[in-house]
Structures are given as C-alpha cells and as structure tokens.
A protein has these predicted regions:
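N-terminal targeting signals for export/organelle localization
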Residues: 1-46
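A short beta-strand-turn-helix
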Residues: 49-66, 96
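Solvent-exposed coil/turn segments that connect beta secondary-structure elements
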Residues: 74, 107-110, 142-143, 155
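Flexible coil segments in periplasmic/lumen-exposed cytochrome c-class electron-transfer proteins
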Residues: 170-183
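Short active-site neighborhood of thiol/selenol oxidoreductases, capturing the structured segment around
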Residues: 62-77, 102
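Non-catalytic, surface beta->alpha helical segment in thiol-disulfide oxidoreductase systems
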Residues: 85-87, 124-173
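Typically the conserved alpha-helix immediately C-terminal to a functionally engaged Cys/Sec
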Residues: 78-97
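Structural alpha/beta surface segment adjacent to cysteine/selenocysteine redox centers
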Residues: 105-132
Length: 183
C-alpha cells in the first residue's frame, strides 16, 4: 500500500473522506427536513385559528357560527393538558372548524377587549363570565348570547358530544341528557 506511505497522502485521503461524509450528511439533513414538512402537512391538515375575543366575536357574527371561548391561565396545568390532549385531536378540530370560531382569553391578562361598548381587561372579562376555575370553556351563539359554560379539563371523548350538541343546535330543543341518550 504505497498510496498511504507518505504523511501527505494520508492527510489528503482523510480530507477527501471528510468532504464526502460532510456532503452526504448535508444532503440527508435537508432531505429529512423536506420529508418532515410534507409529513406534517399530510398527517395534520386541520389547524385551529385561535382568535382574540373581539376578532372572534366579529368573525362568528359574520360567518354565523358559534363561539367557543377558552378561558385559561399561563400557570394552569390542566389548560395545557387540554390544549395538548383535547384541542389537538383531528376530530375535535374538524367539528370546531365547521361550527365554531375559537377564541382564547388569558384570564389573568391586562390585555384590553371591548365588551358591551366598554374597554375592559381580559381579567375583568373572565369575571363577567363568572370564571372561577381553569380551564373554563364558554359557548356563545353567533349574536354573542351565552349558551353555557363548561368548567374544567375535558377529555376528547367527553368534549365531542358537547361540541356536537351545541354546534348542531340541539341545545335549543332538548336537554343534554336527552341528546346523550339519543346518540
């Protein structure tokens, strides 16, 4: 093996090998990013467009959809769990996108909103909705009239019937118990 006999030849071979490894490493890195982006688009085509309170109410009125308001706090573990385990499910997102405009309100925020022509904070808004625990989900009609609150963490299995009951307008004619027996 005369090719490796000099120190200069050994260094040259090593440099060539490193360049080849680096090139193929970069190529596979960028290919993986493209594949990951495509996989995310294919596996999760649904997304929830969370709006501010006033944007959500205006859009619901315009599109004649119900409003779902998620009252949360930054420190609330069950709020994060509901985001991760309930709102992230495709079936939940599908129902919400079809029938609701979704709104998030930080119940401890000093961000300003307009309620009944008056500027108040999101914290004050939570008090107006009598939110005392987190998360609390409120449902409104498109004209902003209140339908019902749903306090606490709710699993996907519990949430879907509630979304359908309200989103399909069943609450106007039968109780939730009657609806539950029907489905």
């Amino acid at each position: 093996m005369k090719i490796f006999s000099t120190k200069r030849n050994k260094i040259m071979v090593l440099v060539i090998l490193l360049v080849i490894v680096f090139f193929f490493g970069l190529k596979s890195y960028f290919k993986t990013d493209e594949q990951n982006a495509e996989a995310v688009e294919q596996t999760n085509p649904l997304a929830l467009n969370w709006l501010s309170y006033n944007e959500g109410l205006a859009l619901a009125e315009k599109e004649n959809k119900y409003v779902l308001i998620d009252f949360y706090t930054d420190w609330c573990g069950y709020c994060k769990k509901m985001d991760k385990e309930t709102y992230s499910k495709d079936e939940v997102k599908k129902i919400l996108n079809e029938n609701f405009v979704v709104v998030k309100v930080n119940a401890e925020s000093e961000n300003k909103v307009i309620e009944n022509g008056e500027e108040i904070t999101e914290r004050e808004l939570a008090r107006l909705y009598q939110v005392s625990g987190y998360p609390t989900t409120w449902f409104l009609e498109s004209n902003h009239s209140r339908v019902a609150p749903l306090p606490g963490y709710v699993t996907t299995e519990q949430f879907i019937p509630v979304l359908n009951y309200i989103g399909e307008g069943w609450y106007k004619s039968i109780t939730f118990k009657e609806y539950s027996e029907k489905i």
